[in-house]
């Protein structure tokens, strides 16, 4: 079989990230991040979700929509290795794949019935940009999907280090309270590209309608400005 049926977009995610910069590198790293999955009109059928509420977590199969036009590469530079070492694309989760498909496990917080949008899935811990197309949704099965003795290869050897976040109270007050823990969690993950280590450089990250400017010196990330975007 040389061809497969065309994939259908079943939903899109609504998240606090209008751009790629700042998105956690894996799902579940910042559980405080809230998002919503809105189905396309032809899939707003409550019966299609029957039984899903019994699962605490779900798998999202999605499209790297920003990488579709970029092609693929047999080797890539994983951020975990500082962006300097090449690994095979199939040993990584790089978006630059023959088929630019992503896979994320997220917590299912509930299903909201919306008059216009139909059933909407409320999730936590997603690592997706706002508007990302969702190709499929499957339940997470602990007895089959969890492997406590699994080896993480080079990713296990290079565990991420959390930064200490210095967020001046006057600036934190500009962030709506419902977004504060999530924003601090994202900043603690060090949003910078792995090859950026200049302590004098100022970075800007769009999040939840805000533009957050910061710098990193050593293991401390200092927030410098919070502006309405």
PLM regions: where:
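Conserved positions in beta-strands of structured domains
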Residues: 14, 106-109
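Mixed-charge, low-complexity intrinsically disordered regions
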Residues: 1-101, 113-122, 126-229
């Amino acid at each position: 079989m040389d061809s497969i049926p065309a994939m259908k977009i079943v939903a899109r995610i609504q998240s606090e990230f209008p751009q790629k910069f700042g998105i956690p590198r894996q799902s579940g790293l910042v559980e405080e991040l809230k998002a919503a999955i809105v189905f396309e009109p032809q899939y707003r059928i409550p019966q299609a979700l029957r039984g899903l509420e019994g699962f605490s977590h779900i798998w999202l199969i999605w499209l790297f929509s920003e990488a579709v036009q970029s092609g693929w590469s047999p080797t890539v530079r994983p951020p975990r290795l500082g962006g300097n070492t090449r690994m095979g694309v199939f040993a990584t989760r790089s978006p630059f794949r023959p088929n630019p498909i992503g896979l994320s496990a997220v917590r299912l917080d509930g299903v909201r019935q919306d008059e216009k949008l139909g059933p909407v899935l409320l999730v936590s811990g997603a690592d997706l940009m706002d508007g990302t197309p969702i190709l499929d949704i499957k339940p997470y099965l602990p007895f089959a999907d969890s492997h406590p003795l699994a080896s993480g290869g080079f990713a296990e050897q290079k565990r991420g280090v959390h930064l200490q976040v210095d967020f001046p109270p006057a600036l934190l007050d500009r962030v709506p309270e419902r977004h504060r823990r999530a924003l601090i969690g994202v900043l603690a993950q060090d949003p910078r590209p792995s090859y950026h280590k200049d302590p004098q450089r100022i970075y800007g990250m769009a999040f939840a309608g805000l533009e957050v400017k910061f710098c990193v010196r050593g293991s401390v990330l200092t927030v410098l400005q919070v502006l309405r975007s």
